[in-house]
């Protein structure tokens, strides 16, 4: 588990779970540079539940396909936990395109989006997905 940015009561907490450490590090830097988010990276999906319990995220960005554990299995563990069941989860994957995501695709009730390749796309995704910002 790698936590970046300074904790603040006004900063939303985002957990990024992906076996690709390059993606989690880049995404963490993008979000951290806004000074609006406290970000935690987890590259071992088998530790995602424990990391989420310790970090108390406001949002979880979760890779859908990982070698050690399927993203849907990880999401099921998180949503069945009494402390975490209300935390929004967004699946991020390289398996769909922006066009395919426009129809509001969901897996097990969770939004599915293509992995953001640009910092502005990532920031927009986080802002749309956070309960405080999305109107959810």
What is the predicted role of each segment?
Residues 21-40:
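Two-component/phosphorelay signaling modules centered on CheY-like receiver
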Residues 66:
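Receiver (REC) domain active-site loop signature in two-component systems and cognate sites
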Residues 42-46, 119:
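Conserved Asp/Asn-Gly motif in the active-site loop of CheY-like receiver
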Residues 55-61:
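Active-site beta3 strand of CheY-like receiver
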Residues 1-15, 118-136:
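Non-catalytic signal-transmission and effector/linker regions of two-component phosphorelay proteins
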